[in-house]
């Protein structure tokens, strides 16, 4: 019988007969063979025992290897069994046995009877304490093929068995620890692997279970760094998943799920596993969370990142691990357990041994020297010169490289053409109470960081929600795309306080010490001016997008200016250059607390960023002056006088003007050619009169060399005749009807003014292609916006201005100019008020014949009127229009009144002069006068023989196309590349749009206020949409100032998508005809 290994039928019959006999000293070996679930050591020992029967060993010898014994219940049915835990000895390996009762155990010791079940501990994956709905104190053993659990009576008994089993399992494993955890693919799981927890789960065919055919009963084995799925009773390879690949996990009732990233062996997806009950599912969830949080202790692992949009997250940094002097394994080629998203890039030798580095967002516990990518895909690294820039006393926080070191990378959201990888990996990990998160994102190769949609902003937090990063280590100069360039690294070895004072700097010397490092550091701002060199002109770039349609934008980029580039044409991108005396002042010893003060300062060493561009030609002449603040310490947002205006709009900078820079370099939005436009007292009085100058299309350029190409703002008033106060006009200069007065300005003689002042277009051309429009920046309206805007275009062809500058429409329309207080009188109409001073001595008789005698070549002197609810009252008495405040009509009447002839009225008048219009009246009165001409002004040549062509009024249907705010007069041949600056962001609450045009008849009328009636009924929403005027005469004067050609000699006017007016005569030069795209 000793040599028989496989039992036959005869053997089975013999065994059956032997069972009927009383117990013998030699147990039946075949019966023992049948009871065992697998080949164990007891089988091997029983076979030779049949040859040489021996008496049973004494009880003391048999119980020497017993470590623990006692009654426990089986989990499934609750049957009580007697369990014996044996340690490794000469009798066999460590094992767990159980008998029906203690009596059989003792009898078996004497008679050699075998236990009912033997579980070798070296085959067990792990032992764990469990609890379910029925049993609160379970001790579970897991092997590859089965799960065996025992229920203890109380927690102390549970802990005793658990500790004993754990010790024996660890002793039996030896050196078989974590040998397979380095695998990231499918493989076999060797028996004896130590796991923290093992669960028997039923993987459902859902998500990855269906895609990867993973459904069925599995062992879910959790170790300290990985999780394994072992198919029960199958030879299918195990699935190994690193904990770092798990994005999140959770449970729902009796289901536990895991979501893994795309770097896992199974790919991205979810695994849904069914367990016994919700208690087990909750325990699994909590155990996974605790294990993943404890993963921080392993230095070779770092937090994973979330695969989400990079533009939705702010920047932060992880500051847990630090490499001082040595690079991480990802930089030296020893990348064994680094994550898949780590990018290995070449690092120059100069950047390998330094104590200053960039903190990367793609590292969690580890780090690397992350370079910043430029537009061309080049990499800029740290330099060892940065080491010497830090302060040694341990208070400095920011360290910057000198500007001539070439580390200012221009970054923008443009594709990288010749770089191997177009993405830069970032790592983020987070966790909450119900799930862990660890995903992956790839950041576009853009270093623009302030949250623009196209830029690669990202977030990085500590592993599993430990702590977010700290933004204070990353100071961004502005949110322009080209502002990142050189981000200050972290000074690792300095002892810094974790808490900073949030109060304002009280010492004038309290500049950041990194200003001492780069003596001429300049802060970046939005580019508000253009370079003088026409070849190097570029469009302004905002943080939102880049103008990809412009070749100049794609070819030229503004770089951080070094001291060698002070005469460059790109200097206008910098504001508040800390130069000369400011740089000298910053060399003083100062204490740096690392925070930027949030309160304004009265000296130029405050950390506020002035918003004024500086002179391109002589940057050294500009010194930053103290900021204008009030008694409460708030920054005054008024424009300054003198030099900024002159420098911005092209004037020569004088010494007196530079010394008057009193507002810290804020942009003066007022008229740009007069030095004495605004007095300092206007700032003290909180004058709001200067708020009327807002951003207008940059295409309104000057015709003469005196105008500056830097100016991107165009005042709509007369360039040489700034609206002023004087006894001759008697009009208070105010915009909001308040007491804020603008100081008087000098008015030069008309002859010298036309030659010296900047010539601006008097007509706003519509629909010019290629035009750039800068949106309005501010709106200082007195009250809230009414229900519908009055969209004014107020053009005054006058040689003498008689009213103050008027702000843009208070209703928020960038296409309107005029008084914000008077707009509210009639919020339902969209006016275009053209006030023309006729300056031809022979105009009186000519105006009687035809309205077409009006020359389209008007004077370039433009002033903003203050419209009111009444028309301008002409002193000649022939074209006086009475008030219409007390009546509202849906129609307007245009009356053609001559200066020396009785008025021709389309509507009757009452005794007191009040208009009596009827709905049948379609045109409003057009008052035409005459003034003496001055230096090529508005000319009215000889009358024409043909009959008068009155104004043609086109009336639109109420359901038809409403008039656009930019569809106004387009008097076609004023030079300059005008653009349709009134085509965007206009609110049109009413289409009752009337074009009200009149000509003054006496030069004394400039002493009176020019007002216009804007009364319109709300009953008719289909107002005047177009008005066509034929305004050419027989002889066009070629010497008219408005007839100059473009700088390139061309008079071609580009046409937009709106209607322009064709002013032609058979015997006159033909202006550009109206076309409609």
Curated annotation (Swiss-Prot):
Span of domain PH: 65-170
Biased composition (Low complexity): 445-457
Domain of life: Eukaryota
Annotated ranges, domain IRS-type PTB: 195-299
Keyword Transferase among record annotations: no
Single GO BP term: insulin receptor signaling pathway
Post-translational modification: Phosphorylated by INSR.
InterPro entries attached to this UniProt entry: IRS, IRS_PTB, PH-like_dom_sf, PH_domain
Chain ranges for the short sequence motif YXXM motif 9 as given in the UniProt record: 891-894
GO cellular component terms, A-Z: cytosol; plasma membrane
Locus of motif YXXM motif 6: 634-637
UniProt motif YXXM motif 2: location: 147-150
Pfam families registered for this protein in UniProt: IRS (PF02174), PH (PF00169)
UniProt feature, compositional bias: Polar residues: 350-364, 428-444, 477-495, 530-544
Motif (YXXM motif 7): 666-669
GO molecular function terms attached to this record: insulin receptor binding; phosphatidylinositol 3-kinase binding
Location of the motif YXXM motif 1: 33-36
Residues spanned by motif YXXM motif 3: 499-502
Keywords, sorted A to Z: Phosphoprotein, Repeat, Transducer
Gene3D superfamilies linked to this entry: Pleckstrin-homology domain (PH domain)/Phosphotyrosine-binding domain (PTB)
Sequence motif YXXM motif 8, residues: 713-716
Role noted for this protein: Potentiates insulin signaling.
Protein name (record): Insulin receptor substrate 2-B
Organism name: Xenopus laevis (African clawed frog)
Source lineage: Eukaryota, Metazoa, Chordata, Craniata, Vertebrata
């Amino acid at each position: 019988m000793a040599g028989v290994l496989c039992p036959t039928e005869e053997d089975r019959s013999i065994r059956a007969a032997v069972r009927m006999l009383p117990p013998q000293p030699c147990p039946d070996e075949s019966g023992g063979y049948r009871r065992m679930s697998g080949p164990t050591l007891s089988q091997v020992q029983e076979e030779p025992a049949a040859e040489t029967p021996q008496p049973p060993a004494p009880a003391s010898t048999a119980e020497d290897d017993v470590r623990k014994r006692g009654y426990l219940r089986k989990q499934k049915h609750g049957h009580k069994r007697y369990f014996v835990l044996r340690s490794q000895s000469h009798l066999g390996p460590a094992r767990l046995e159980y008998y029906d009762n203690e009596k059989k155990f003792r009898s078996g010791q004497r008679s050699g009877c075998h236990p009912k079940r033997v579980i070798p501990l070296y085959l067990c994956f792990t032992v764990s304490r469990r609890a379910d709905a029925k049993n609160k104190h379970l001790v579970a053993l897991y092997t590859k093929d089965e799960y065996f659990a025992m229920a203890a009576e109380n927690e102390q008994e549970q802990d005793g068995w658990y500790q004993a089993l754990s010790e024996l399992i660890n002793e039996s494993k030896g050196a078989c620890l974590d040998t397979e955890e380095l695998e990231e693919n499918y493989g076999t799981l060797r028996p004896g692997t130590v796991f923290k927890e093992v669960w028997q789960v039923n993987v459902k065919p859902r998500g990855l279970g269906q895609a990867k055919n993973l459904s069925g009963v599995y062992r879910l084995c959790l170790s300290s760094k990985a999780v394994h799925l072992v198919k029960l009773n199958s030879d299918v390879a195990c699935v190994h998943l690193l904990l770092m690949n798990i994005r999140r996990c959770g449970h729902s009732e009796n289901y536990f799920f895991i979501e893994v990233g795309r770097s896992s062996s199974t790919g991205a997806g979810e695994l849904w596993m069914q367990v016994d009950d919700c208690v087990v599912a909750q325990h699994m969830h909590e155990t996974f969370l605790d294990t993943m949080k404890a993963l921080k202790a392993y230095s070779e692992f770092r937090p994973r990142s979330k695969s989400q949009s990079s533009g939705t997250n702010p920047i932060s940094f992880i500051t847990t691990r630090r490499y001082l002097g040595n690079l991480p394994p990802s930089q030296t080629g020893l990348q064994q357990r680094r994550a898949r998203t780590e990018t290995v890039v070449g690092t120059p030798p100069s950047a390998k041994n330094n104590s200053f580095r960039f903190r990367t967002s793609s590292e969690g516990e580890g780090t690397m020297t992350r370079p910043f990518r430029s537009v061309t895909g080049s990499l800029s690294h740290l330099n060892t010169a940065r080491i010497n820039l830090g302060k040694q006393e341990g208070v400095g926080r920011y360290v910057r490289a000198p500007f001539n070191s070439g580390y200012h990378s221009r970054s923008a959201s443009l594709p990288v053409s010749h770089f191997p990888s177009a993405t830069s990996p970032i790592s983020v990990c987070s966790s909450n109470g119900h799930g862990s998160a660890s995903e992956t994102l790839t950041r576009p190769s853009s270093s623009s960081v302030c949250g623009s949609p196209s830029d690669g902003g990202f977030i990085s937090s500590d592993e599993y929600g430990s702590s977010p990063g700290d933004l204070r280590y990353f100071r961004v100069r502005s949110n322009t795309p080209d502002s990142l360039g050189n981000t200050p690294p972290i000074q690792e070895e300095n002892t810094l306080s974790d808490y900073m004072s949030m109060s304002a700097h009280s010492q004038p010397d309290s500049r950041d010490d990194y200003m001492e490092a780069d003596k001429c550091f300049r802060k970046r701002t939005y580019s508000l001016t253009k370079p003088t060199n026409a070849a190097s002109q570029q469009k302004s770039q905002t943080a939102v997008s880049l103008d990809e349609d412009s070749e100049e934008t794609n070819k030229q980029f503004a770089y951080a200016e070094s001291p060698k580039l002070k005469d460059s044409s790109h200097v206008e991108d910098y504001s508040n250059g800390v130069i000369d005396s400011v740089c000298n002042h910053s060399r003083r010893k100062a204490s740096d607390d690392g925070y930027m003060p949030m309160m304004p300062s009265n000296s130029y060493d405050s950390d506020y960023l002035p918003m004024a561009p500086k002179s391109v030609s002589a940057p050294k002449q500009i010194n930053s002056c103290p900021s204008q603040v009030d008694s409460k310490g708030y920054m005054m947002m008024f424009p300054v006088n003198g030099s900024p205006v002159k420098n911005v709009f092209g004037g020569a900078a004088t010494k007196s003007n530079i010394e008057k820079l009193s507002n810290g370099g804020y942009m003066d939005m007022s008229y740009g050619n007069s030095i004495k436009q605004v007095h300092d007292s206007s700032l003290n009085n909180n004058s709001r009169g200067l708020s009327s100058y807002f951003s207008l299309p940059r295409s309104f350029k000057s015709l003469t060399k005196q105008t500056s190409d830097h100016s991107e703002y165009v005042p709509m008033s007369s360039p040489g005749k700034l609206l002023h106060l004087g006894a001759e006009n008697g009009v208070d200069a105010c915009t909001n009807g308040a007491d804020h007065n603008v100081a008087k300005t000098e008015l030069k003689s008309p002859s010298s003014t036309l030659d010296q002042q900047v010539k601006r277009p008097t007509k706003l051309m519509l629909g010019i292609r290629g035009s750039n429009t800068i949106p309005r920046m501010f709106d200082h309206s007195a009250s809230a916006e009414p229900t519908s805007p009055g969209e004014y275009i107020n053009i005054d062809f006058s040689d003498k201005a008689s009213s103050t500058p008027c702000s843009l429409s208070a209703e928020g329309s960038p296409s309107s100019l005029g008084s914000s207080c008077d707009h509210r009188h009639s919020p339902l109409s969209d006016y275009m008020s053209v006030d023309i001073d006729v300056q031809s001595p022979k105009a009186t008789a000519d105006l009687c014949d035809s309205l077409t005698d009006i020359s389209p070549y008007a004077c370039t002197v433009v002033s903003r009127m203050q419209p009111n609810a009444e028309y301008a009252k002409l002193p000649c008495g022939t074209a006086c229009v009475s008030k219409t405040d007390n009546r509202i009509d849906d129609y307007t009447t245009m009356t053609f009144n001559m200066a020396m002839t009785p008025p021709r009225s389309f509507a009757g008048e009452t005794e007191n002069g009040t208009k009596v219009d009827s709905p049948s009246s379609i045109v409003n009165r057009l008052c035409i006068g005459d003034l003496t001409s001055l230096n090529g002004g508005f000319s009215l040549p000889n009358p024409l023989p043909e009959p008068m062509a009155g104004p043609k009024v086109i009336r639109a249907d109420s359901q038809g196309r409403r008039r656009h705010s930019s569809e106004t007069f387009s008097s076609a041949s004023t030079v300059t590349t005008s653009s349709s600056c009134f085509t965007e962001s206009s609110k049109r609450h009413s289409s009752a749009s009337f074009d009200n045009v009149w000509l003054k008849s006496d030069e004394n009328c400039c002493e009176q206020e020019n007002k216009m009636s804007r009364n319109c009924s709300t009953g008719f929403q289909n107002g005047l949409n177009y008005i066509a005027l034929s305004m050419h005469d027989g002889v066009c004067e070629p010497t008219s100032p408005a007839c100059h050609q473009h700088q390139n000699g061309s008079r071609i006017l580009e046409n937009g998508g709106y209607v322009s007016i064709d002013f032609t005569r058979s015997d006159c030069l033909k202006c550009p005809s109206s076309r409609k795209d």
